[in-house]
Amino acid sequence: MIVEKPCRVVAVVSGGPDSTCYTALWLKRGCDVHALSFLYGQKAVVEVERAQLLLRRLDGIAAERGWGRVVEHRVVDLSSLGELWRGTQLTDPSVSVEQSYTPTVVVPIRNVVMAAVATAYAYTVGRNAGAKTYVILGSHYDDIKPREDTWEPLYPDCSPECVEAMQTAFRICHFRGERGVEIWTPSREGLRKSQLLKMCHQEVGDLIYDTWSCYKSGEAHCGSCESCKNRHAAFIEAGLPDCTAYLTPPGPGFEKRGQFYLHISCKKQ
């Protein structure tokens, strides 16, 4: 893609590797970042705390390298939505977090809700800014693998088609002269999770190990949920050591070090 300069980005940053790495990519592209993290009643509320830490560190790296800067980080409290999003593993206390993918892991059109808020803010920060404004989310190409039963995307609101439809709708819903906001995701750029991790590690190094993927909040990644397993698989596929601390091994090749399990590829002490 061609990024118009000067540029600013409203980034939805969860604290996970996908949104963190994609934000780093846009900082490297020279765009200033207005970061938004969302409280939406999720069980893994620790991810927002990680986002705050990671964005501070990313801004330090960006300053050293002459990239764009993290202008601000706002936490948007939509926690009351957790009462509406019932029956999903991520928000409903009565629904257990599964060890493999089932449709109940999907929070219905969560990305659409967040993208709508982010785009509304983008129209605000972009007004009279004299810069091209983008909205970015971390959904990647692996999120849209087909389900085995219906062949629909695993996570429908992560698809490029959904992203492009949102962009069109949000433009139609605003004034003609201010319709320049674009919405981008790794999936729209054709990037897989492992590709994001590899690119990110080349730029920010071990910072990627401080991201949070687990669907639960705990002292370390649980290692048993689908997201933990996807995280580990992506590190291995990217040819990177997985230095994530897990409570249980998400795959083969792990050894216990102290309280946690680390993969044998990790040489960190």
Swiss-Prot record:
Q: Which Gene3D superfamilies match?
A: HUPs
Q: Name one Pfam family in it.
A: QueC
Source domain of life: Archaea
Q: Which residues bind ATP?
A: 13-23
**Keyword vocabulary terms for this entry:** ATP-binding, Ligase, Metal-binding, Nucleotide-binding, Zinc
InterPro entries xref list: QueC (IPR018317), Rossmann-like_a/b/a_fold (IPR014729)
User: According to the record, how does the cofactor bind?
Assistant: Binds 1 zinc ion per subunit.
Q: What is this protein called?
A: 7-cyano-7-deazaguanine synthase
